[in-house]
Amino acid sequence: MEQPEDMASLSEFDSLAGSIPATKVEITVSCRNLLDKDMFSKSDPLCVMYTQGMENKQWREFGRTEVIDNTLNPDFVRKFIVDYFFEEKQNLRFDLYDVDSKSPDLSKHDFLGQAFCTLGEIVGSSGSRLEKPLTIGTFSLNSRTGKPMPAVSNGGVPGKKCGTIILSAEELSNCRDVATMQFCANKLDKKDFFGKSDPFLVFYRSNEDGTFTICHKTEVMKNTLNPVWQTFSIPVRALCNGDYDRTIKVEVYDWDRDGSHDFIGEFTTSYRELARGQSQFNIYEVINPKKKMKKKKYVNSGTVTLLSFAVESESTFLDYIKGGTQINFTVAIDFTASNGNPSQSTSLHYMSPYQLNAYALALTAVGEIIQHYDSDKMFPALGFGAKLPPDGRVSHEFPLNGNQENPSCCGIDGILEAYHSSLRTVQLYGPTNFAPVVTHVARNAAAVQDGSQYSVLLIITDGVISDMAQTKEAIVNAAKLPMSIIIVGVGQAEFDAMVELDGDDVRISSRGKLAERDIVQFVPFRDYVDRTGNHVLSMARLARDVLAEIPDQLVSYMKAQGIRPRPPPAAPAQSPPQSPAHSPPGSPVHTHI
């Protein structure tokens, strides 16, 4: 059946489709002690940055700095501005060249070395400043064909150290701005047969490709044609992605109980226009295009007026990270008998010589991203639901490395090693109790509440939770502490209880006490199993979904406690670049490569 005109389907309003765009960071590049390839002077360096596609793993050139004449210690002026996603592994590559001509073909220039890292590594380093040695690998990529070619063809020696690259990340200032505004409307069209309209506004930001993404929806004002909506706040990047002149579309609807909301009309504006505040420039005619086409005398379907507008700068996730906040990562693994005998291929704990099991895949996907925000890379790893040697005592909080005093493992590989070792020594048993591991991490989080540390607990489980009441109480208590909980459900069990713990729809409570914050994120592993066998891509999606809420959860805790970000640590003193004989240090050559 064709939808009546001026009606919108419920699905358009089910959720705020399209996440807030990532914050943008500016990467600054410096190098020290580059190889000297020029016979009678120093090298003329250029840095090329590449990003790697998540799906095809191909390196794509992102941009180039300027060429700096006659120096082995360049401080490049031209920056790289990139979108930052905490929840994604954003691989970067930096190639250095000594430019010998005006040719844009990189194979015409001497290769000086390269470095690989992730954006998270740069951001998570002390002061968001990362130093890495430049090396000449066995292969580099031909800039024209994209195919590997021997790096030695440019005169390098594979594996040789070629100086140091220094990468600094700075969040762009307009990414931290939050706009607060209020609107009212006057003489909106009457849509309800037995009463006035029930109007609400829907805001959309425009995308680069001309499409629109919903970014805010006001509350519904019942039975009025002259509504005054409540004041609301929204990150500027959500409204316009930092582009002050980008179109913002606002649609006006009449709410209907059955979800088939009636379209009243629309108008467009921009952040720059809104920032003028209350004025004649911010009174908008609400236009219904279909009515305008059909009726010659049509004027408008009412007006919407901006009553107030203010913008302030808020502390962001990256402010806290740059100020030294460490993310303490702990993993807890389900060793209950419902996983199946680890020696059999049907077991969720089966260790195939050919591929990682679901537990190891989930752990690696989350761990390899979060590890860069913990400077010592020592991660506590716990197990629950097993009988331990030598006496068969059932434990719901045992160290995978067997060390009761210090359950920390060195890196993600250390956790995997301890996990595999535990499978050979403990007996899978039960029941599935979460409360002990939640309480364990909460105890550590409670010990440091000055903003210098934030704990993230990853629980990987296969079964129906056995201690729901105790777990709810532990989570409600943990919600006032600097910690978040990620739960990944593996296997084919029903995970209804996990969805309840997630608290996206209904905030969890215990003994009549509501959790102060939503700190739990749950995903079922089976939703990410790629039938094509592309585990890399499917696990990247899993990590993205479970980690996406962590930055906001960290900031919400800090704000609730009144904790401001600390100033970034001072950068270590560098030896000043040596001035070349006939060119000031850092003077760019006017050659566009």
From Swiss-Prot:
Localization terms from the record: Perikaryon; Cell projection
Tissue specificity note: Expressed in the cerebra and cerebellum of newborn brain. Expressed in the eye, lung and muscles but weakly expressed in the adult brain (at protein level).
Main location (coarse class): other
Annotated GO MF terms: calcium-dependent phospholipid binding; metal ion binding
Pfam families per UniProt: C2, Copine
Binding site for Ca(2+) 4: D192, D198, D254, D256
Protein residues bound to Ca(2+) 1: D38, D44, D98, D100
Domain C2: 2-134, 161-284
Residues making up the signal peptide according to the UniProt record: none
GO cellular component: neuron projection; neuronal cell body; perikaryon
Biased composition (Pro residues): 565-587
Entry annotated with the keyword Phosphoprotein: yes
Known function: Probable calcium-dependent phospholipid-binding protein that may play a role in calcium-mediated intracellular processes. Plays a role in dendrite formation by melanocytes.
Name under which the protein is recorded: Copine-5
Organism: Mus musculus (Mouse)
